[in-house]
Amino acid sequence: MRDCGRRCVYCAAALEFDYATLDHVHPLSRGGAHVPGNVVLACGRCNRLKGDLLPTEFFARFPSAGMNFIMYARTVHRALKRCARRAVSLAYARAA
């Protein structure tokens, strides 16, 4: 939750742990996968609004959600890179 700034990926509302929901960016019902790169934290309201819409459909209806998502994706991308660097460093250290 820290990696997303504790905010909803779509509306940027502050998220409390008890009210955060997981959203599949590309819905499972439409061929999306249950993998880390396809799962984000969202508030319940945004998750319900998005439903099984594809990101392009949702962002066409709610452009501000698209802008927030772009900001969030950048944050997550950096966080994932940091995690990957740590994992690689640890793997090399164990192999040595």
Language-model features and meaning:
Residues 9-11, 45:
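Short, cysteine/histidine-rich loop/knuckle motifs that typically chelate Zn2+
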Residues 12-41, 56, 60:
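Histidine-centered nuclease catalytic patch
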Residues 37-38, 45-96:
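A detector for short metal-coordination/catalytic motifs
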